[in-house]
Amino acid sequence: LSNYDFSASPALPYINQELMKAYAARDIIGVSLKKTTRVKFKQINYKKPFKSPTYTKKTLGKKNFFAAKDGYLFGANNLEMQFRTFPAFQAEIIGGKAKHGKLSGDSGINSPIGKVLQGVGIREFPTRTEIANLIKRENDKFFEMLYAEYLNAGEDSKVTLDDMKKKLGKKDSNWLESKYLVTFMFNRLQGKEQKFLELAYRYAKSESEDSCVHLKAM
């Protein structure tokens, strides 16, 4: 290991460059493990270029806005990214044949989801705790905020604020937190969905530009 100087710089690009040299020489091999009976390894971030997913559409619920607490970004080849509380706010990326990983969003703009949002130029995203406290302490204000996001999302403007309260008044806090966060986020992602999906996909699969070369157990 004396051939590699990891102390020369704390910057990730430099460290990743040294790890790339060590991997090519088979001196250091990082491995991402999973519990399985049959192991097949795939090289990640080594020579083969990353294949970006292609964004196709988004929806605030597969049936309608009020029927579910989640929202989806869809991509080509049956790719979908589901956002919801479970019980923490998170995103799960699901492909046609396999699940590709999760990202947490509970801590707002400083969470993994928040980091991806920052990567596309978005600087605000509330924490789930902030929204939960608002629901508990200022319920009317929360519904006014949710209704504003609902209208900004292009949903049915014939639905009034009172209609929304009647439809969602009996939903628990976790449901409301989820719906607000995903609607807030989708409104700010308008026009940036492709870049967000690409960055989130890379992050969840440990194939981001900051990720080092490694073997992944499939």
Functional labels for PLM-detected ranges:
Residues 1-218:
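Short, positively charged
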